[in-house]
């Protein structure tokens, strides 16, 4: 009996020691996992992964370790391994909501929609009170273009959680995207019959506007303003009703109210006015510039230092041909927002469009000092110098671009193309052609480079066979480009093929060539060589009218041809 009792005691002791050992091991591993989680939260992913890997190598039965391995993989954009880790976590704890939810979202983000849908549907069955699942499920159906299932899911949300403004807008959006406008309006009307919402009223008004039911739209906007007198969409919508019905006094009165409201920010207000300026007829600007000036003053008073207001005013003054005032606005914006690259780019683009080459070159270099990673600025400086005829400084800008390009092969090619043009103007033709050859190795079908290269060879009357082949490619690529047609036609003429050249020039004239003294002169030469003297002099006379020095000695040449024709 004593021996039996002793045996039982020994078993109990051994069992308790084993239990203690297991509990101690679990506590130790849990502490390691907690340390890994802390590292993860501190974005120390490498250290966190090392700890979790050690845990799982010792015992792969810890679901939390697999879960955080997955989260680290997500942060490192390794979706495939993240999915594997989450599946392992779920196999250890199949009821865990977060493991399954994370895997479902990961499937969705990696376009594995069938897997995502299956997992979301299971989650919705197991956790029917989580509204987020329904919305995300509907979004997946939308991405798949399955609007009917998306609408049915939205109806489930309404049945499960009740009607709300946000849900109504969501239902409206889905139905509208599906092309079922009637169903979309039903969702708005259903909500409006039971509740009051300025947002829903504005959506109803917007739909009436699309149907050209201006008076009904105005009624909805006014109802919305009765609920909230400063509701910006209703204020703007009401103003728009007056604008499109040509009631301009009321339009500007309501526009000013909208511009003064706190319900919209500067970006929204300037965005509306920019759209208006971009799309209105020129006579609108002429007729209502005093009223628009007031709108600009309102915005200036409210937002004296806002970049978007400077940009809007610069655009407005440009459209109304007050270029000095426009330049001042763009310049002030760039000066007062020196860290805002977009403000600087907008200013430089204005200088470019306004053809203020001296300012463009200086401001481009100054901008590059502030933004030394942005090669757009030496590009703009190069354009300025090039148009000033300062080819040496333009060339230096190109070299600056090349020194700061990195791996951008396309910009490398375009810069070499510009350098080729510059070298040609500097009469360094070998260097020019070397640049063009380098570009064509990168982009062999570049029509701009092919055309310039071919035309310059034609001007030198050398290697016309190569010039012919390059020019032919440009015309095949852009058959209606007058410049390319002119080059190809001129090469054919130089090759003694004026009859083949003639139709190319006729086509060039149909596509803008009549505005170029060079093209007109070339066509006249072709006609003259074919013995069509009267027509040749018609086009030479047109060339003389258009010429601004583009054809050196044109007047003298035409007179000489006239004398030749009389013999």
Where are these regions (language model features)?
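N-terminal leader/linker segments that initiate helical-solenoid repeat arrays
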Residues: 19-69, 75-87, 91, 118, ...
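Amphipathic alpha-helical repeat scaffolds of TPR domains
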Residues: 27-31, 260-281, 305-308, 312, ...
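Helix-start (N-cap) detector for alpha-helical repeat units in TPR-like alpha-solenoids
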Residues: 29, 63-64, 97-98, 130-132, ...
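Residue-level recognition of tetratricopeptide repeat
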Residues: 37, 71, 105, 139, ...
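Register position in tetratricopeptide repeats
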Residues: 41-42, 75-76, 109-110, 143-144, ...
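Structural marker of alpha-solenoid helical repeat scaffolds
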Residues: 58, 92, 126-127, 160-161, ...
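Canonical tetratricopeptide repeat
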Residues: 68, 102, 136, 170-171, ...
